[in-house]
Amino acid sequence: MHRKGGQTLRLYTHFLLHLSPHHHSFLDSIWQRKMVHPSSAFHPYTRPIPTTSGHDLPVDDSLRLLLSAEALIALAQLQDASKILPSYEPVKDFSPQLLPAMTPTPIIATPSIPEQPQPLQSPSAPNEKSRRKRTTFSPEQATRLEAEYIGDSYMAREKRHLLAQSLKLSENQVKTWFQNRRAKDKRDRKSENASNHTSNSRRSSPSRKSSSDSTPTPTQATQFDMPTQIQTASPPTTADSAIFPPTSPESIIQKIEQFPSNQILPNFDILQTYLQSLSSSQIPLQFVPSTPPLFDPNMLQLYHVIFEFSQSETCSVSFQRNSASNMRSLLIFVFFATIFAVDAQYDSADSSQSEDLPDIAPESVSSEEIIEVDVNIEGSGSGDGPIIDQVHMFGILPGPGDIRKKRGILEILGRK
């Protein structure tokens, strides 16, 4: 800190300067040009600060102590600026690409030592040193080695040493040749086994295919398309043999549980139309089944259908000259037709009719509806089994609607 004319001057520098008389004259010329505005000659950090002191310093002494930014720039442009020595050394441990800000721009240009160009090294150069040279055997050597290998693939050390001397080869070369030859044989055996396995599999595949083709595919027995409540537990042939034993011509009574009609046949109109067509025709008919069909039309090839009715409690329906193989379908057909007709008549009956009906005792009311089918067999057919003469259906209906339902059956059959 220096004082001049009641002003305090602060100077901050980090450089060690060696000024020659030539430099002093240069600074004096700069100060003379700046005398018009003395404050402009100072650096912003070295401008005078007013103080109360009254001591004065000569102008020449102040010029030697003050360094402005313009003086430093001018000194850097001088030819003999090599005398300016920085007070620190550049860091050599870090590369300029990683820390560019830490490497200052050198003011002094030092002559660089030219680097000697180094020959480029290929990437495979390190491997070439460790890689062994490939030995080329002459035809005579290869023939002799092959003959010895056929005789003994695992040669003893003494014999291998003698063989190497006779062939003018080293023992390691002979040993390596035998190792490579054994590895080649191993690869050949693996490939041969794989090819044999492939050929065997190709030969066996046609036989498997032919055996699968010769196996007959079991055909599914034709079943009626009905709801889940009614399922056929055995094929028709078993049912026919059970219903019509070949040695016993006696009558067989079967009891079949009755199911709700709305779950068995939703399309009652189709069945009613079918019944009308059967009653009006006297010749065999060909039917087109609906989708899905209730029964197979081929199973109902009837020659003639006659509906018999009476005033008794028993409703009798007769079929003439029907084959035994179609009996199962006939029973199902007659059973369903009777139930649907009764339900339709019962739903449309007037409530006034129920007043004229006699009362039924409570003990006569049953918990379920049972239909008994009585089959009468007479004689035998021409190749189709016994001929069915009559099929009688007996309706036992529950509740107060007993008699009314039976009368409904008779009325419907009477209109036919």
From Swiss-Prot:
The keyword Nucleus applies. Residues 118-127, 219-240 have a biased composition (Polar residues). GO terms for molecular function: DNA binding; DNA-binding transcription factor activity, RNA polymerase II-specific. One of its GO terms (cellular component) is nucleus. SUPFAM superfamilies: Homeodomain-like. Residues 103-144, 178-247 are annotated as: Disordered. Residues 103-113, 193-218 have a biased composition (Low complexity). The keyword DNA-binding applies. Residues 130-189 bind DNA. Keywords: DNA-binding, Homeobox, Nucleus. InterPro entries: HD, Homeobox_CS, Homeobox_TF, Homeodomain-like_sf. It is found in: Nucleus. This is Homeobox protein ceh-62. It comes from Caenorhabditis elegans. The lineage of its organism: Eukaryota, Metazoa, Ecdysozoa, Nematoda, Chromadorea.
